[in-house]
Amino acid sequence: MLSINLNLIVAFLLALMGVLIYRSHLMSTLLCLEGMMLSLFILMTLLITHFHMFSMSMTPLILLVFSACEAAIGLALLVKISATHGSDHIQNLNLLQC
């Protein structure tokens, strides 16, 4: 069980580093955020089943719902930004120009 938890924590940290490194493109940032949410979901599910905390069994599903909402809003923003600016480079966006 320890090696699985360690692998999931490493996956979360790699996705976090991906967000920090590839923050110039919106699509790369969204993919790294999805990786972070997926590793958190799996880690939370494993910890709940390992420690027999069945009263918290709805928490991973709530996290998954928020992750899906975050992905939908992020993709809608990506489509809108790509349509108006022609690329998903974050540094080319000027928020005062709307």
UniProtKB/Swiss-Prot annotation:
One of its GO terms (biological process) is ATP synthesis coupled electron transport. InterPro entries: NADH_UbQ_OxRdtase_chain4L/K, NUOK/Mnh_C1-like. One of its GO terms (molecular function) is NADH dehydrogenase (ubiquinone) activity. It catalyses: a ubiquinone + NADH + 5 H(+)(in) = a ubiquinol + NAD(+) + 4 H(+)(out). Core subunit of the mitochondrial membrane respiratory chain NADH dehydrogenase (Complex I) which catalyzes electron transfer from NADH through the respiratory chain, using ubiquinone as an electron acceptor. Part of the enzyme membrane arm which is embedded in the lipid bilayer and involved in proton translocation. Core subunit of respiratory chain NADH dehydrogenase (Complex I) which is composed of 45 different subunits. This is NADH-ubiquinone oxidoreductase chain 4L. The gene is MT-ND4L.
